Amino acid sequence: MISSERLDLVPLDAEALSLVVVGDVPGLERALGVVVPPEWPATVPARLRLDQLAEDPAELPWLVRAMVDRDERRIVGVTGFHGRPDDRGRAEVGYEVLPGARRRGYAREAVLALADWANASGAALTCVASVAPTNEASLSLVRSLGFRQVGERLDPVDGVELVFERGLPFSLDP
């Protein structure tokens, strides 16, 4: 688990991802020991991540995590990397905060915690974020964290995305 000031970023193993796939919210609550909002499972790319784990179980720490508000013991979003860093040390981060928990700094806190963890791992040199050009909140977040746009790409699911990169470690001056 990765912890920050308010969040625990709990890795979703194959058992938890299987519960997400079938939409078993009570089972997830028992497995994770937290309150799982009914809309949360729909935000998790569970089938894709299950396939990645089946192919390489060592990917687990780099994949999807529940974003848990520690005080409330409630899931407020999902975050993680798309997989281990590539051969150039680039790891792509992803995040989604549930609508009722937005505008509280959870995404920023999660990305900073993941970046610190990735840097400490020694395997990642660069953090990548791909953002839809219409997602103003996410664009504002990555820019505020010092990410720089390096291009764009066409995602088969999400359409056009702007690609941003930020070297590790993060050093944010006030």
Residue ranges and their predicted role:
Residues V111-L114, A118, T126:
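A short beta-strand-loop micro-motif that forms or neighbors metal/cofactor-
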Residues C127-V131:
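Conserved hydrophobic beta-strand within the GNAT/NAT acetyltransferase core sheet
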Residues A101, G105-A113:
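Conserved acetyl-CoA pyrophosphate-binding loop and the N-cap/start of the following alpha-helix
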Residues M1-E92, E96-G100, W117, S121, ...:
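GNAT-family acyltransferases
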